A protein has these predicted regions:
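Ser/Thr/Gly/Pro-rich low-complexity, disordered linker/stalk segments of secreted
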Residues: 24, 29, 75, 623-646
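Long, contiguous C-terminal flanking segments immediately downstream of a protein's structured core
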Residues: 90-113, 117-121, 125-132, 139-140, ...
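Short, surface-exposed beta-strand/strand-loop-strand elements in extracellular ectodomains
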Residues: 711-723
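Right-handed parallel beta-helix
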Residues: 295-305, 319-330, 342-358, 367-368, ...
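Extracellular beta-strand/beta-solenoid scaffold signature
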Residues: 279-287, 309-313, 330-339, 359-371, ...
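Glycan-recognition and processing domains
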Residues: 640-690
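Surface-exposed, short loops/turns at beta-strand junctions within beta-sandwich domains
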Residues: 152-160, 741-745
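Short beta-strands within extracellular/lumenal beta-sheet-rich domains
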Residues: 678-699, 713, 735-737, 757-760
Length: 769
């Protein structure tokens, strides 16, 4: 008698799983140098097969069985365990990552590079300075901008560096396709000024050599995570820790007065008001508030496009706080406000634009960068774009020991700075560039040393309240003699070695003169260490100069010559963000030097500003429109990928070396000193009997050559033939730009001396349509 055996569905499936196991004997290791089939299992494991060794892959739709048959006759069988099948073309390592631009900046270096076909991400390494070997930078520092990628290495001490870009496919580095660029000169931030005077350590989270302080923490903030980023913060003096979420909420933990661990907040891309978790100050925006402790906090932008739009930054009751390398647009009131009970604070390399138009004297916003209730402060290397009221220094509160240096007052109107009460105020090496109202304003018993600044078409370079140019020497109508500063008492100015051109009026003190011994805008000295006589006092208030700048304990500093200030401030290492930021606007000096109204075109562009950032490689959720990361799916045994795209503009410079690996320059450099497209370039390739540049483009381009006018050459030879195209000279920039010359893919070009010696400063290749 036959017995029947009944099995449950569960038991049956168990037996099937036991007796129908996968049979896998022919899979190979992942190899990016050959075409492969990728079989991904439900478990997440991947089995790889070289397509040249596979004759077929068969799928049974009834049982979900997959069979991989090899050309040698063997087969691997997967019994319902396959999740997906994909095909991966080999990576063409004959074409390495194309670096289109690489430069050192201030305590950082960056590299721009084209997409590498097949790469899902990149690893970037830096070597030099504190890094004896190539050291990987944080993945958050690698971003896509659609037409190109960018990576920034940050926290570098001064020195020469190299960077290496390695494409990554499926979390595996393709080292054969890596590209290295070297000779990237990194300089230190200039730390001269009162912020660092008698400071016990570096201002912010960095030491004075540009490296991070011991134990420093870093958080990265973008629109993708400004509300969700979290960090553990100390909240009482017993060591209690609290996890705070959202960037404003994290910073608010400092109000407990106990958190002092160094922290760097690195801002990536554009942050709008709606992106923030909250804002601690309804009037200003992001509030950085302590309780008088050394906070060791730096807020800095990554690259050239970090921007706060719709809000600014308020710093209150803080010590050792640093703001650097970001832009502020369309803020509610002040752009930056150092306000109340701050010490040793520093704001530098910021781009500050219009605020919200609230009419009247707030049509361009309120203060761009105001300092109130603060001691030991430096405001340096900032770019002010047509600001209405730049730098209020005291609103009647106690402000002292403040330095303003290397700022670019670009068509801004007034308050550069406007000073009350401060007895130790140093203003030097600033570029006053087309200012419609006045430069430095001294009131209420203040003492200001104004040194080695460059004034171009600044209406009144210096004013003292109720005397001199401020009231037309007391002569004229009531309007002429009213004054600028609400009838406040005067402050006194010592001036040394300033350069002025195009001003309406500047009246220096003249001893014994009936008018100019009373009505003067500044006391001008011939020697920096000359002291002002005690009898020199302001007409209203009777304030004399305290000669603070000649005291033995005055801080050490190294000023630039006044004549060099425009080139320094507008140069590559100059004012504003890295690369002068991602927003550019050219002022028409003929109309804007004297205009103090809002420029509607500029205002509209700022309102409409949008970031070109597409993707942060470690944050897939950054954008809804980021490039896909799927693997290519060619036919079995398909062709190799096309050579990598060179669709972006290629720019190469020769400041001591070629900035692009495509170009080989003879080591024959000379000083050209040009300003091209807003960037200052010092050196170029000297085309004499020794100089040459050789390159082979991988696609067709239109080539523009830029020569320095310091040498007579206005043409070159290309492969032995003299160029015949004409060009245009830019006297202000000191360069001669040839009209475009066509170059063809896969052809070697050698550029040498033409009719006369020349200095080739820059080559720009624009892809042909």
């Amino acid at each position: 008698m036959m017995k029947k055996l009944f099995l449950s569905a569960y038991a049956l499936s168990f037996l099937i799983s036991v007796f129908a196991q996968d049979v896998v004997n022919h899979a190979v290791a992942r190899d990016f140098t050959v075409n492969q089939a990728l079989v991904t299992l439900m478990s997440g494991d991947k089995k790889c097969y070289n397509t040249s060794s596979v004759s077929s892959i068969d799928l049974d739709h009834h049982s979900d069985k997959v069979t991989v048959t090899t050309t040698s006759g063997g087969s691997d069988v997967f019994n319902g365990s396959v999740y997906s099948i994909a095909f991966s073309k080999r990576v063409n390592t004959e074409n390495a990552v194309q670096i289109t631009e690489a430069k050192g900046w201030l305590e950082s270096a960056y590299v721009l590079f084209a997409d590498f076909i097949g790469a899902t991400s990149y690893h970037v390494y830096v070597k030099g300075g504190q890094y004896s070997d190539f050291t990987q930078i944080d993945n958050q520092l690698i971003r896509s901008y659609g037409t190109h990628n960018r990576a920034d290495a940050m926290g570098l001490k001064a020195g020469d560096y190299a960077m290496k870009v390695v494409p990554v496919v499926d979390e595996t580095e393709i080292n054969e396709a890596a590209t290295i660029v070297d000779n990237l000169t990194v300089k230190s931030f200039n730390r001269d000024g009162y912020a660092h005077y008698n400071a016990s350590s570096g201002i912010g989270a960095y030491t004075n050599d540009g490296t991070l302080k011991n134990g420093a923490r870093i958080i990265y903030v973008s629109k993708a995570n400004a509300k969700t980023v979290s960090l553990e913060m100390q909240v009482d003096n017993k060591g209690k820790m609290e996890t705070r979420t959202g960037i404003q909420n994290i910073i608010q933990a400092y109000e407990k007065g106990v958190e002092t661990r160094p922290l760097v907040v690195r801002v990536i891309g554009l942050l709008k008001k709606a992106d923030m978790d909250e804002l601690g100050s309804s009037a200003i925006g992001l509030q950085v508030k302590g309780k008088g402790q050394n906070m060791n906090l730096t807020i800095e932008g990554v690259g050239s496009d970090a921007t706060f739009h719709g809000f600014g930054v308020l710093v209150r009751a803080c010590k050792y706080v640093e703001l650097r390398n970001f832009g502020v647009m369309m803020h509610e009131e002040d752009g930056i406000s150092f306000d109340t009970d701050n010490e040793h604070v520093w704001g530098h390399h910021l781009d500050i634009f219009y605020g919200k138009n609230k009419g009247g004297d707030k049509a361009k916003g309120d203060g761009s960068f105001d300092v109130k209730g603060t001691l030991y402060c430096t405001v340096s290397d900032n770019h002010f774009w047509d600001s209405g009221k730049c730098n209020l220094n005291s609103n009647g509160d106690e402000v002292d020991f403040v330095t303003y240096r290397h700022n670019w007052y670009d068509h801004s109107d007034s308050r550069h700075p406007r000073v009350r009460k401060s007895k130790h105020l140093h203003v030097y090496n600033n570029y006053f560039d087309g200012n419609s109202k006045y430069g430095v304003g001294a009131t209420t018993g203040s003492c200001i040393f104004v040194e080695k600044n460059y004034y171009r078409n600044c209406k009144y370079p210096m004013l003292i309240s109720k005397q001199g140019s401020d009231i037309h020497n007391g002569v004229g109508s009531a309007a002429d003699t009213k004054g600028t500063f609400s009838s406040e008492d005067g402050g006194i100015i010592k001036a040394f070695d300033n350069y002025m051109t195009g001003q309406k009026s500047f009246e220096p003190y003249i001893a014994g003169d009936a008018t100019y011994s009373k009505h003067f805008d500044a006391y001008v000295v011939e020697n920096r260490n000359e002291q002002l006589p005690s009898e020199v006092v302001t007409l209203q208030g009777g304030t004399g100069y305290n000669n603070f700048d000649t005291a033995s304990d005055f801080y050490s500093y190294s000023p630039d010559a006044a004549a060099d200030v425009p080139a320094v401030v507008t140069g590559h290492y100059g004012a504003g963000r890295c690369n002068h930021g991602d927003f550019q606007y050219t002022f028409d000096n003929a109309t804007e030097d004297a205009n103090y109204d809002v420029i509607l075109d500029l205002s509209n562009k700022l309102e409409a500003y949008a970031s070109s950032l597409v993707k942060i490689y470690c944050l897939d959720e950054y954008s809804d429109e980021q490039p896909g990361g799927d693997e290519p799916t060619p036919e079995l045994g398909g062709d190799d990928p096309d050579p990598q795209s060179q669709d972006s503009v290629v720019i190469v410079t020769f400041n001591g070396s070629s900035s692009n690996a495509m170009f080989t320059a003879a080591e024959n450099y000379g000083d050209g000193k040009i300003t091209y497209d807003g960037t200052y370039y010092k050196k170029g390739e000297k085309l004499d009997s020794k100089g040459s540049v050789v390159f082979t483009p991988q696609k067709d381009y239109n080539m523009v050559l830029v020569l320095a006018t310091v040498k007579p050459g206005r043409d070159v030879k290309i492969n032995g033939e003299k160029t015949t195209v004409s060009g245009a000279e830019n006297a202000e920039g000191a360069y001669y730009e040839l009209l475009p010359i066509s170059v063809t893919a896969d052809t070697e070009y050698k550029i040498t001396k033409g009719s006369a010696e020349a200095i080739l400063m820059l080559i720009k290749l624009t892809p042909k349509e």
